[in-house]
Design a protein with these regions (language model features):
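Extended alpha-helical coiled-coil scaffold domains characteristic of the BAR superfamily
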Residues: 93-103, 210-213
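Alpha-helical scaffold segments that form or flank carboxylate-/histidine-based iron centers
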Residues: 5-13, 35-50, 89-93, 117-131, ...
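Basic/polar, acidic-poor N-terminal "presequence/leader" segments
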Residues: 1-35
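Helix-loop segments that flank and shape redox-cofactor active sites
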Residues: 21-42, 84, 100-117
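Acidic/His metal-coordination segments adjacent to aromatic residues that form catalytic metal sites
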Residues: 1-12, 73-96
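A contiguous pocket-lining binding segment that forms or flanks enzyme active sites
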Residues: 108-169
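Conserved alpha-helical segments that form or flank metal/cofactor-binding pockets of metalloenzymes
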Residues: 44-71, 137-139
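Extended, helix-rich structural scaffolds rather than catalytic motifs
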Residues: 148-234
Length: 234
């Protein structure tokens, strides 16, 4: 069973991530090219804030001030977003899809170790708000209209994966209770490399789902194609 400290760290991390997602989607909504897109993203932002409120309330129920639980993760998450500022609306959409997808896989793996009510809370918070379908349809439409953007977006997605995993390693290295929880989600910490070795293997497996997301976006196979030379797939 997960330790109380590990659960607190997980919920604090997820709560701050949901709060940041609310801010990010609100910004994306302001940049959206049409009123319907603005409204759709605005609705998704509201859903993310609702997720944050659920987590905040659960942390408070545990007897921990929510701000105290979130504070250790402000630096790593803010650093990730500072290092991956999108240059346009499409890059913002890809960032949300790729980054949120890796994070969701990460949280779902850990949720298996939680008590049933907390596990269900995490899964409810991770439920798709319609953002995945929204992003894939817009990115695919943009590629159909201008195939040259595919190479740029694919390289951007690859960079996002590297940055996301680097910050996840940082969090695991700095927060021992969370590191033990992560190690328990994949194997025994007695294996080669101890807890950090198990965590590294977990992160390696998380990249497998990235290939599926790239295919869903229509970006599979584009990472090595310079934008100026990209005539279109096939």
């Amino acid at each position: 069973m997960a330790s109380a400290e590990g659960v607190r760290d997980l919920l604090g991390l997820l709560a701050y991530a949901e709060l940041v997602a609310f801010f990010r989607l609100s910004e994306d909504a302001a940049l959206a090219p049409s009123l319907s897109d603005k409204a759709a993203l605005g609705g998704m932002a509201v859903a993310e804030f609702g997720h944050f409120q659920l987590l905040r309330d659960e942390i408070a129920r545990m007897g921990v001030p929510p701000e105290q639980a979130m504070l250790p993760f402000v630096g790593p998450l803010d650093d990730f977003h500072a290092r991956t500022t999108p240059s346009d609306w499409l890059e913002g959409l890809v960032k949300a899809y790729v980054g949120d997808g890796i994070a969701a896989d990460f949280y779902r793996a850990i949720a298996e170790l939680l008590d049933p009510p907390t596990r269900q809370l995490v899964l409810d918070v991770l439920a798709d708000t319609g953002h995945a379908d929204f992003v894939t349809s817009r990115v695919r439409a943009a590629i159909d209209a201008d195939p040259a953007v595919a190479g740029r977006l694919a390289l951007w997605a690859r960079r996002l994966v590297g940055e996301a995993l680097a910050q996840a390693h940082r969090v695991a290295a700095e927060r021992a209770p969370l590191a033990r929880l992560l190690a328990g989600a994949v194997s025994s910490p007695d294996g080669p490399g101890g807890e950090q070795g198990e965590i590294g293997r977990m992160f390696a497996r998380l990249t497998d789902a990235h290939d599926e997301r790239m295919a869903a976006l229509g970006l599979a196979g584009w990472e090595r194609v310079p934008e100026a030379e990209a005539p279109g797939p096939g």
